[in-house]
Amino acid sequence: LSQAVLLYSKQKPYLEGIIYNKSHHITEPDEKYYVPKASEISIDTGLKSKLEVEEHGIKIGSPVVYKPQSVEMKNDCIAGTSVDDRAGCAVLLELARHLKKRKSGPTVHIVFSVQEEFNLRGAMSAAHQVRPDIAIQLDLMLATDTPETTEYGDMILGEGPGMSLFSFHGRGTLNGVIPHPSLVNLMELSAEQKEIKLQRSAQVGVLTDLSYIQQ
């Protein structure tokens, strides 16, 4: 609630809006700790009528996203909109710059997939076309260095990249990934040679495109 959003329309790249929040002065006690459903949320764009909304190209199904913002914090930390998985995109772009300089080596395909959060099928078409021998997925890793998350693992923000040794959705789909031991050894050896801290993780409730790429 009270979050800035962007509504994409045909007339402009977007319209700015705010998720409507009932005034604190008229909020009932039982409403103050209630999380509204998506169907109960309204967005105020400043437009005064249904006709005005339609004239600006806003229709049922028009995309709405949170307005991007970012904050630089201490110790090289950042907070922002959609860091999952723009951080992964940044890593891949830097990788592409390094690969461009090499003279020889195996073929590397870099894929930026879509709809991973929605149905996990965004990377499947690329996998069917490329048919890779090895697939490496870059995605978020659940940090467990705050008081309420310590029971879920030992992943500390800023202590190096994390390598998933086990992932399983566990909520409605029997799918996950256990990486091949030889690839795990390769990652650990490479990290050791480059003096890169490498953390390890095993999680239930986490699923990425890699679960479907391997099919």
Question: Which ranges hold each PLM region?
Answer:
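N-terminal hydrophobic/helix-forming segments and targeting peptides
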Residues: L1-Q215
